[in-house]
Amino acid sequence: MASPVQALLLDMDGVMAEVSQSYRQAIIDTARHFGVSVTHEDIDHTKLAGNANNDWQLTHRLVVDGLNGASSAPTLEAVTAQFEALYQGVGNTLGLCELETLLTPKGLLRELHRRQPKGMAVVTGRPRKDCAKFLTTHGIEDLFPVQIWLEDCPPKPSPEPILLALKALGVEACHAAMVGDTVDDIIAGRKAGAVAYGVLTPQTYAKSILEQTPAAIGKVLEQVGASVVLTPGLGELLDLVPAVPTASKAPTVNGKSGVREANISRVTKETSISVKLSLDGTGKSKVSSGIGFLDHMLTALAKHSRFDLELDCKGDTWIDDHHTTEDCALTLGEAFDVALGDRAGIARFGSACVPLDEALSRAIVDISSRAHSEINLQLVRPSVGELSSEMITHFFESFASAALXTLHVDVLRGRNDHHRAEASFKALAVALRTAVKHDATAGVPSTKGVLA
């Protein structure tokens, strides 16, 4: 039986930091400065070969190779200087570092930190100042009292960075896990005796979905020792490193432990709606809204969220679809809010990318009790079936408003509006399923101590 994980060691770039527009762009632009064309695929290929944890050296290698080893090739020092000018910025010109974003939700990182008896460490090939700036910018420096940088020792795939982190955390290798996106990360972790978890970058993950083929890097990471390959955001770590609760308690609704369901009725001069919703179902549904395409979408939502849903609506569809669609969304959102109860013991965050043929949609949910939505479906046709395109967007907005959740839904690509819309509803369903998942160790998943 595997030893329980007591400490997490996280790489930074591609794991916590989105660097496609910063470090990677600096590689491409630096190479261009010296007359060499480098693509993201070239960078991936070089990193896949290993021994590529230092981006200055990696850039120099790509430039020299691109110039076929010519005597006029720049020195490592010259390449490093150009790289740093682009990344850090010069004078009034902002550096590419300003484009970096946090890949892993801050709330998830804090929950993972809470679960680790020995804590968490950053083990990165970044220089100290770049690592510190990113952690401070995103307000997570307190989660990583141990930080191993480029200056500390030989870089991965050497096990030395891992061993230094383990020593500082006071944990045996067999009780620690290294999380990284490159073969160097995995090899270093395994050489040090730790468990190794691979992770796909957002670009690699999106490409694998669009092409409907497994990511090649995932197979390679497994071959060099990764026990599992995670998707961007690291949400699966909640299943891999569960904490032992001191007092396990299922989510409660109005004092009834373990019951997460609601019956809501809404009657106006325009519609009469009843909704019965169970968050712990199997995806059964019985939907009759009076709008065929809306029924189709709500059936898909129930199926892929694993919610049991009964919805019946009598609305003034002889006028148009506005009142019926909006009120169905509001009633369903209210039922969702009531079924959640005090929100204790849930994961809170959920995200999903879901394809439907050529279409790819992404949904991100935060059950925050702060109603907000950003919806971009890129629909072209005036309607899909009897449901107007503007009301498809408005459905998501109304649901988020009544459910008291933050919701982002984006169509990343697609040509067929039916596919765009359906992929969006399915992405929302999968994201909701993750967000409401029972987590006995989470307590109230907010540093405020309340989600209300």
Curated annotation (Swiss-Prot):
Q: What CDD domains would the database entry show?
A: IGPD
Which reactions is this enzyme annotated as catalysing?
D-erythro-1-(imidazol-4-yl)glycerol 3-phosphate = 3-(imidazol-4-yl)-2-oxopropyl phosphate + H2O
- Which SUPFAM superfamilies does the annotation name? HAD-like (SSF56784), Ribosomal protein S5 domain 2-like (SSF54211)
Provide the GO biological process annotations: L-histidine biosynthetic process
Superkingdom of this protein's organism:
Eukaryota
Keyword list, A-Z: Amino-acid biosynthesis, Histidine biosynthesis, Lyase, Multifunctional enzyme
> Which of the seven top EC classes does this enzyme belong to?
lyase
The UniProt GO MF terms for this protein read: imidazoleglycerol-phosphate dehydratase activity; phosphatase activity
Q: Where is this region: Unknown activity?
A: 1-233
User: What EC number(s) does this enzyme carry?
Assistant: 4.2.1.19
The regions listed as transmembrane in this protein's record are none
Instruction: Name the InterPro entries for this protein.
Output: HAD-like_sf (IPR036412), HAD-SF_hydro_IA (IPR006439), HAD-SF_TIGR01548 (IPR006438), HAD_sf (IPR023214), Histidinol-phos (IPR006543), IGPD_sf (IPR038494), ImidazoleglycerolP_deHydtase (IPR000807), ImidazoleglycerP_deHydtase_CS (IPR020565)
Biological or metabolic pathway of the protein = Amino-acid biosynthesis; L-histidine biosynthesis; L-histidine from 5-phospho-alpha-D-ribose 1-diphosphate: step 6/9
| One Pfam family linked to the record | Hydrolase
Its family? Belongs to the imidazoleglycerol-phosphate dehydratase family.
NCBIfam families registered for this protein in UniProt:
HAD-SF-IA-hyp1, HAD-SF-IA-v1, Histidinol-ppas, PRK00951.2-1, PRK00951.2-4
What name does the UniProt record give this protein?
Answer: Imidazoleglycerol-phosphate dehydratase
Q: Which organism is it from?
A: Phytophthora nicotianae
Which gene name does the record give?
A: HIS3
